[in-house]
Amino acid sequence: YQQLMRERSNKVKNHIAANHSEKVKHIISMVPDGGNYKDLPEEYKDSRNFHVAWTRFASDKPAPTIDTGHRHHFHYKYNRVPTVRECARLQSFPDDFIFLGNKTQQFRQVGNAVPPIMAECIAKQLKKYLGEN
């Protein structure tokens, strides 16, 4: 999969990590692999209005749905939210696809998109079906 995503690219774009404060990084560090805000000690649960959407990706399971928000999930390994490129990779965008606009707009483009590999599979099935009729 990684080789396929990197096939036509010699540089990774849209891969700038968020610059979280030390306090936020500390709070994120307390969320276990696959966990969410409910795993935080009580004194931290209201410190940044964490809610159920704040989850850490599980390192050994498929990622949850990527949506238009860019602060709903934490990276499975690093104490930060994923980059636009990491979300795009999960959505099957090849690394040579460049998202334009500010970071919020880029995350919105990724979250609103139909994953390219899924779109290709649907198109192949439609072509097959329409070719038969």
Short names for language-model regions:
Residues 1-133:
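C-terminal target-recognition/interaction regions appended to catalytic cores
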